[in-house]
Design a protein with these regions (language model features):
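Short, aromatic-enriched amphipathic alpha-helices that serve as compact interaction elements
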Residues: 1-19
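A solvent-exposed, acidic/Ser-Thr-rich amphipathic alpha-helical stretch
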Residues: 21-70
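Hydrophobic/aromatic beta-strand elements that line small-molecule binding cavities or substrate pockets
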Residues: 53, 67-72, 85-87, 100-108, ...
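Hydrophobic residues on conserved beta-strands that form the core of alpha/beta folds
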Residues: 65-67, 82, 115
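Short beta-strand edge/turn micro-motifs at domain boundaries
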Residues: 80, 97-126
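Short, cysteine-centered beta-strand-loop-beta hairpins and adjacent loop/turn segments enriched
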Residues: 88-96
């Protein structure tokens, strides 16, 4: 699977309520920690990111993920991407819907592509 396919697989897993934590790399002692910024949180360190994603999967449902402009560049062991994503989900009896911007970095480790950084922000007019 290449980096683009990994990103599509992540989107599909989000839509279907499947585990997301496995898409993220473990921290390495020689590197700074993995970071994931979502619409409402910033998680630092692989353990925090993975627990945050498990909590998200447990507390949300009915995800809509509409990728509108995925752009991926892949090199030997690193890839980066950006996307414009329509995002919606149910949580606590309330529907949340946002136009979001995604960017991130993946690294090829042990035969798989894993996120080492992910940033999701809400697009707003000024």
């Amino acid at each position: 699977m290449d980096a683009r396919a990994t990103i599509h697989d992540y989107y599909d897993s989000l839509r279907h309520g499947a585990p997301l934590d496995t898409f993220f790399a473990d921290d390495r002692p020689e590197d700074d920690a993995v970071v994931k910024c979502g619409v409402s949180e910033r998680l630092v360190g692989a353990d925090s990111v993975k627990q945050g994603l498990r909590d998200q999967t447990a507390s949300t449902s009915d995800w809509a993920v509409d990728s509108r402009d995925l752009r991926v560049t892949q090199r030997d062991t690193v890839a980066w991407f950006s996307d414009d994503v329509g995002l919606a989900w149910d949580e606590g009896g309330q529907r949340h819907e946002f136009d979001t911007r995604w960017s991130g970095t993946l690294e090829h480790r042990a035969g798989d592509w894993s996120f080492v950084g992910l940033h999701v922000s809400v697009a707003t007019d000024l």
